[in-house]
Amino acid sequence: LRVHFPLNKELVKAVEGVSFSINQGETLAVVGESGSGKSVTAMSILRLNDMAGAEMPTGSIKLRLKNNEVVDMFETSEKDLVNIRGNHVSMIFQEPMTCLNPVLTVGLQISEAIMIHQGLNEEKARDKTLEMLNLVRIPDPNKVINSYPHHFSGGMRQRVMIAMALSCRPQLLIADEPTT
């Protein structure tokens, strides 16, 4: 994998020649100094660097979907990426406050992801949301489901993001800075 960002008529080589393979049930930790490309690598798997101004990464990211179909994330259409993100691959971002919508309740945000990716109706998605909030040990999920992100500490917002990421049972879970 190679990812370059244009900067002042030059290219910054954010990731240069990273290669790894992850099989079902395995855990992989990517470690390195600050600025070494760990987050860029993680974002590349979901093709989120496209939105951050990166040139199209080179290399390939092959993903075996739940139906055993193998796709190359760099050759996948935007429409198919919507299905893959969340349903097959989820990411827990480093800073939950930048990922959670401040004007929507956390319950609605988790439920929407479930309805989009699992096709559940509103009532069943709400039940699944409560189940996920319980799973990540958020106290009083029936109250929390109607609360807004700014009502929570950073650690509780992180748990909300974990609940959302796990809600669709992805095959690959990416955690950016999981220990912060």
Region annotations inferred by a language model:
Residues 62, 124-143:
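Conserved ABC ATPase "signature" region
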Residues 110, 162:
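Hydrophobic anchor residue at the start of the ABC signature
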Residues 167-171:
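A short, proline-enriched helix->beta-strand linker immediately N-terminal to the Walker B motif
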Residues 6, 60-83, 121:
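ABC ATPase NBD Q-loop/coupling interface
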Residues 147-152, 156:
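Conserved ABC ATPase signature
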Residues 173-176:
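Catalytic Walker B motif of ABC-type/P-loop ATPase nucleotide-binding domains
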